[in-house]
């Protein structure tokens, strides 16, 4: 099973923001659900994962701001003790998952971790050798976590792709069809070994209709200067968004929400018929701008 914690630059001071999103998705909670319905779903998830401690479920419910006093009365403890118990409840939940089957936990953009989630991740790493769990944490070089020196932690530095691997990525995107040498050279020179830039730039060139597609290769229709190669990855992505026409508002709204957004949230934000919204999201997924995880209405979308 895969668990994903997606950190956000807009929530660096929101305690346990990635964990809350994970729990909501895992339990299938929707904003239109009543508190009672959401608690029922949380209870069902706890039972499925073998969590029979009511205090643990109560702490998770409190973390999700689900409070029905008759079901889970508030705990009479200090705020610091409550925080400690909440972190332990989350760890217990993850350990129960790992007991059922091996778990891979991915923490994206850890340089945006809020302090409480950083505490949670540090505790998980401290005990990870006891459970069947692989923890993958991606972050920028300037982030210096305390656990980087732990003996059971391996650090990998992801450098720019060498030219040969960059060319292989271009070939994979063109599905084996050969680009004109001058076009491939322009892509590799501009992208400078950045995988996302290589991918987006190659896709942009293929979509621009400046080449004729043959059985095994592409032929440039005009001079190389007509090739659409923006000066930056940001400009390139904005150009691709502009091609979406009127529906680009959906992508722009999703980007304002963060690196990740749910179908439930985008539906409540964008004024558009449900069928039209679903069709637009399908087009965005097909274009490669976003990835979809899960099925609507529980779907979550991630930007590259």
Q: Regions from the language model: what does each represent?
A:
Residues 95, 108-114, 119, 125-126:
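Catalytic acidic motif of RecA-like/P-loop NTPases
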Residues 120-157:
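Sensor-1/coupling segment of RecA-like P-loop NTPase cores
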Residues 6-9, 137-142, 160, 201-205:
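A short beta-strand-to-loop transition that corresponds to the Sensor-1 phosphate-sensing loop
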Residues 19-22, 135, 157, 165-304:
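Short secondary-structure boundary elements
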Residues 5, 19, 60, 86, ...:
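Conserved RecA-like P-loop NTPase ATPase core
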Residues 12-104, 132, 148-151, 156, ...:
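Conserved Walker-type P-loop NTP-binding/catalytic site
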Residues 1-29, 102, 111-116, 128, ...:
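Phosphate-binding active sites in nucleotide-utilizing proteins
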């Amino acid at each position: 099973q895969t668990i994903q914690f997606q950190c956000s630059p807009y929530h660096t001071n929101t305690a346990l923001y990635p964990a809350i999103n994970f729990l909501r998705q895992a339990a299938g909670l929707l904003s239109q659900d009543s508190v009672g319905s959401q608690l029922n779903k949380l209870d069902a998830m706890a039972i499925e994962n073998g969590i029979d401690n009511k205090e643990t479920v109560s702490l998770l419910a409190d973390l999700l701001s689900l409070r029905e006093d008759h079901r889970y009365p508030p705990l009479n403890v200090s705020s610091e003790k409550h925080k400690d118990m909440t972190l332990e409840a989350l760890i217990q939940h993850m350990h129960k998952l790992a007991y059922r089957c091996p778990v891979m936990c991915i923490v994206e953009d850890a340089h945006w971790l809020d302090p409480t989630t950083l505490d949670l991740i540090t505790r998980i790493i401290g005990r990870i050798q006891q459970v069947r769990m692989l923890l993958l944490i991606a972050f920028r070089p300037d982030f210096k976590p305390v656990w980087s020196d732990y003996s059971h932690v391996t650090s990998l530095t992801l450098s720019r792709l060498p030219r040969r691997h960059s060319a292989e990525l271009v070939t994979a995107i063109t599905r084996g069809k050969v680009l004109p040498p001058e076009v491939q050279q322009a892509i590799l020179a501009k992208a400078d070994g950045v995988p996302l830039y290589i991918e987006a730039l190659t896709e942009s060139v293929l979509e621009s209709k400046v080449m004729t597609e043959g059985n095994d290769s592409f032929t440039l229709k005009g001079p190389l200067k007509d090739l659409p190669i923006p000066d930056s990855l940001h400009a390139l992505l904005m150009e691709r968004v502009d091609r979406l026409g009127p529906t680009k508002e959906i992508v722009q709204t999703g980007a304002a929400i963060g690196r990740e957004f749910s179908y439930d949230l985008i539906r409540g934000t964008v004024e558009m018929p449900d069928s039209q919204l679903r069709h637009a999201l399908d087009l965005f997924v097909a274009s490669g701008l976003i990835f979809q995880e899960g099925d609507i209405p529980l779907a979550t979308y991630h930007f590259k």
